[in-house]
């Protein structure tokens, strides 16, 4: 799983006289932020950010200044959100801050294949991490799929009390998988799912549960790239033959070595007859 977070200014950052006046102004807003000033600070920070974007597009401020303002702006937003969380009555301007500030967790699935009702009907399914349950979540996130479609995301989550715009999650550890479960989906979603971006059926497991525990009855492999391409009239065997012809010609002409040709063909076959999702 890959994640993306909004930039944040380090706590130890100090503004210098050489910094752009917009940076200095936004720093003062950030440094003096409190419950009494947060509404004015919110509007001022937005204005400074918009002004910096305009100046950057005209080449008046450089990339370093643009990055400083961006990090500081989101730091102001985080601090306002922290203060607002303790208020009994939260101003309307701050009600969507949780959604804006949430990390993005990119998950290895297609929303259109596995959860079509979520996209088409705004259906809400129970979703939660299924590991590290003995650890308190330290982040919040929205979930993104691996299609190229901007609608391939989950931004509504059910809790015991209401619907929220972010999901409590853990910081993903380097080189470690992180699994999130979607529940009460059922076979109906599988029947409705389509091959958006040519992502096929996922792997499936049939599990039986009794008083003694559980047993895995059957493992069903998901569709391969070759199978999905065949649906849209691309013959996998012909694709391999065409590549073999090109490799043979390239080796004869000295464009690639024999070892490079073999490796290229092996990688191509591995991808073609492999899973449509990341492995």
Q: Which residues are covered by each model-predicted region?
A:
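Charged (often Lys/Glu-rich) extended helix/loop segments that serve as interaction or gating elements
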Residues: 1-279
């Amino acid at each position: 799983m890959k994640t993306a977070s909004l930039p944040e200014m380090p706590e130890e950052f100090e503004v210098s006289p050489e910094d752009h006046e917009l940076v200095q102004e936004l720093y003062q807003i950030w440094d003096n932020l409190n419950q009494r000033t947060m509404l004015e600070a919110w509007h001022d920070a937005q204005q400074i950010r918009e002004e910096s974007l305009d100046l950057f597009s005209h080449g008046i401020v450089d990339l370093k200044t643009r990055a400083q303002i961006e990090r500081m702006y989101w730091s102001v937003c985080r601090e306002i959100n922290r203060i607002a969380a303790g208020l009994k009555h939260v101003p309307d301007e701050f009600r969507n801050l949780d959604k804006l500030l949430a990390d993005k967790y990119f998950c290895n699935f297609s929303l259109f294949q596995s959860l079509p009702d979520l996209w088409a009907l705004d259906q809400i399914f129970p979703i939660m991490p299924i590991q590290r349950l003995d650890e308190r979540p330290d982040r919040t996130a929205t979930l993104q799929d691996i299609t190229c479609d901007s609608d391939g995301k989950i931004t509504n989550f059910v809790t015991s009390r209401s619907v929220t715009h972010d999901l409590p999650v853990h910081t993903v550890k380097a080189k470690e998988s992180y699994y999130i479960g979607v529940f009460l989906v059922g076979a109906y979603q599988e029947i409705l799912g389509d091959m958006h971006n040519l992502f096929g059926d996922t792997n499936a497991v049939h599990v039986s549960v009794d008083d003694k525990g559980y047993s895995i009855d059957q493992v069903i492999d998901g569709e391969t790239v070759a199978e999905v391409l065949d649906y849209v009239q691309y013959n996998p065997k012909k694709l391999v033959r065409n590549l073999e012809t090109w490799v043979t010609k390239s080796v004869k002409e000295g464009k690639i070595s024999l070892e490079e040709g073999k490796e290229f063909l092996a990688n191509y076959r591995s991808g073609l007859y492999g899973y449509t999702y990341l492995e």
